[in-house]
Each structure stands twice: as C-alpha cells, then as structure tokens.
Amino acid sequence: MTAAITQLKMLFKPQWRKALIAAAVAAGFAPVMAQETFKVGIVSFLSGQAAESFGVPAINGAKVLIDSFNKGQAPAPYNKVGFGGMKIEPIYVDENGGATKQVQEMRALYDRDKVDAVVGYVGSGDCLAVAPVAEEMKKFLILYDCGTPRIFEDGKYSYVFRTAAHAAMDNVSLARYLKAKNIKVESINMINQDYAWGQDSKKDFTLAMDQIYKGAKVEADLLPKFGAGQYGTEISALLSKPADILHSSLWGGDLQAFILQAGARGLFQKQQAVFSAADHVLPGLGEKMPNGVILGARGAYGLMSPKSALNDWWFDLYQKANNVYPVQAPYRMAQALMGLKLAAEKAMAANGGKKPTPEQLAAALKGSSWQSPAGTITMALGDGQQAIQDSAIGRTRWDAAKKMVMIDDIMRFPAECVNPPANMKTEDWLKAGFPGAKC
C-alpha cells in the first residue's frame, strides 16, 4: 500500500505532471479534452404547427449525429471523438413562442447555461431578432435553416453564420425548372405566409419569373398569417382566379393543412402546384399528397439528395433511428453541426488544442467549405458567413407498392446557378437577369 501511495505522489510532482501533459499533446490530445465538454444550444420547433414535420425531425437529426460524433463513429473527416476530443453536450430548446421569447431564451443559453455555441432557428422572424443580439453579446451563433436573405444583405456580423442557402435559391430553382420542362406559364396564383419568409419568397419568385417568363401575370396574391391553419377563404379566392401555376412557400403544419383542404376541393387538378419547400410534408401526408406537384426541398435533400458515401451513411443512420427517411430539416441541421465540428477542430489545431473562443470559431468557419450529405457547402456570401449549395426540384408520385410518395423527374442546379454572387444583393441580381450565374 505504501509503495502504491508513493507512486501516486510521484505522478503529481510538477515534473511528472509536465511529462504527462507533454505526452498527451504529442499523442494529439490536449489537456482540455480530459475535463471539458463543448456545450451547444440547439433550437428548433418542439411544439406548435412547425414541430411535427420540421422542428422535431431537425432535433432527431441532431441527436443521432451528436451521438455518432461523441462515439467517434462518423466517417472521415468527422471521425474524431466529439469536437476535437471534447464531448458535445447539447441543450435542446423549443423555438415556439415568437421572436421576443427566442431572444430571451438565447440570452439564457449563453448567460445561464454557458453554451459555447448556439445552432438554431427556422423562423425568419426569429433569425432577424436573435442575430443582432448574439453579435452584441459577442457569442457564436449558427443559423441552421431560416430563409430570408435579409440577414446578411441588410446586416454585417462577426459572430453570426448561416450554414445553408437562403430563399433566393429555392425560387430561382423553381423558375428554371419550369422553363427547362417547357411548362406553360402565362398566369400565376400565389399564397405565402405574411412574414419575412413568405414575403421574401413571393418577391424572389416573382422577380425570377419576370426574367424567365416575361409577361406572365400574377392573378391572386394571398398572404395569410403564419399559423393560420384554416384556408377556406383563400382556396375560394384561388379557385375564382384560374391560373397556370400556383406558387407557395407555405411550410410545416400550414402547408399540410393547405394541401389537405385544397386537395379536397380539387384545386390541384385545376392549377399546377409549385411549392418551394415542401419535401418535409411528404412522409406525413402519404397518399393524401397530390401527384405531379412540383416541389423543392431547400437543397438537394431527402429523396432528391446526391449519391455519396457520406449521404448513404447519414440517410441510413437517421432512418434506422427514426423509422422514416430524413427530409430537409435534419439535413440542414446535419450540415450545420458538421460545419461547426470542422471549424472547432480547425481552431483547436491552431490554438494548441484548447477549447476555441467565439472569435476562433468564427475565424475558422468564415469563408470555409465542407462536404455534407447534400453535397458541398461553401460560405461564399455575406463576407464569408452565408452559405451557398446545390438545389434540386422534382415532381411527386404516390407509389402504392412502396406505400410512400416518390419524387420523379428530378433536376439538380449548381450552387452558382441559383444563388447570387458575393458582390450583389438578391433583388439586384434578379432584376439584372442573374449576371454571373454558372449553370
């Protein structure tokens, strides 16, 4: 016993402690790794109309991916344990409740829970509210989903990033798809939610169509409130104004409700539905989803995702854990967490293996590029803090044998074909006729 105690004392002598630390560093592990975790606040809708088809799948994606990271079971270059050896400790927060509540919740994550980063926010109004607050606090924030281009076109940030493309991509892709498929468009009906996402989507689609289908006329232009749920009046208005296509950026429970109510009244037999962000409702709606709907997924996600070893691994990981395939929300969450992981490890490689500061994380993520299950993510816009990526558009078809909605006639568009260049705002780019687009 005495000999054992003597050996323990020897380990804690200064020279032995230094030797152990040096050995740890030489082996590629910094001392921080033994005692520290990396805390991440993860925010998405866990209740309300956006939870079932969007928020909960996003959180489910975060859970399976973080578990794989912490076990060191993800494929390279994501195969290091946790973030550079630090175990990832997630704190999940419900996004429901409005922008003011989300600002309070985010402050609590940073101040009370001492998170090292926040990854979150689906609602464009929420993103517009939290981004300047995180910047003021000098805290690291990744916006993983929200679509409004205004974040980086109307503001300048050092600590705020968005690791997915904004809404311009979705609507330019739809317009290009319609033209490529020789779909007649002389008249357009529109229904979009009356807040930043819906307003921006409506504007971007209209401006894109002005270039590709010159002379096409907008008939009905409807803006129901977010979370309306009942669309009888709007459906009557749409039926009263015949049009070649019906454009919508509705999403979540709003989109599900609209499809069920409009389908029952035969709207989709009379007007070609063109939905910018609809893939996430396919598993829930099943055979109630109309055939032939043209839709996007806000990226090359889910049934429109590219073939790759990384995507095969991710698709299988999510599907086995949740008994359903991943749609856009978990894909966007995955690319955010993968970008954060690589940024953290890049920063640690430069700082001697210590937990990175917000400034070090920002420097590592700014202007970077990485492979995700959906393809390459490049921080090309917003002074290196706004991502661009490839997109995909297709048509729905119910497969009775598989008992699921399939997507056929898929077209993929390169990131630089459907996103504005770094030196132009979205509206200016659309009005100028897509200068610099590489298709």
Regions found by a protein language model. Give the residues of each.
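Signal peptide-proximal N-terminal region
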Residues: 59-90, 210-216
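Extracytoplasmic "Venus flytrap"
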Residues: 41-65, 93-99, 122-123, 191-200, ...
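Solvent-exposed, acidic/polar segments of extracytosolic/periplasmic ligand-binding ectodomains
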Residues: 369-439
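Sec/Tat signal peptide C-region and signal peptidase I cleavage site
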Residues: 29-34
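Short, well-structured alpha-helical segments in soluble
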Residues: 91-116, 180, 230-242
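Bacterial N-terminal signal peptides that target proteins for export
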Residues: 2-20
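Extracytoplasmic ligand/sensor domains, especially the bilobed periplasmic-binding protein
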Residues: 60, 100, 115-222, 270-296
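Extracellular/periplasmic periplasmic-binding protein-like sensory domains
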Residues: 262-335, 345-351, 406-437
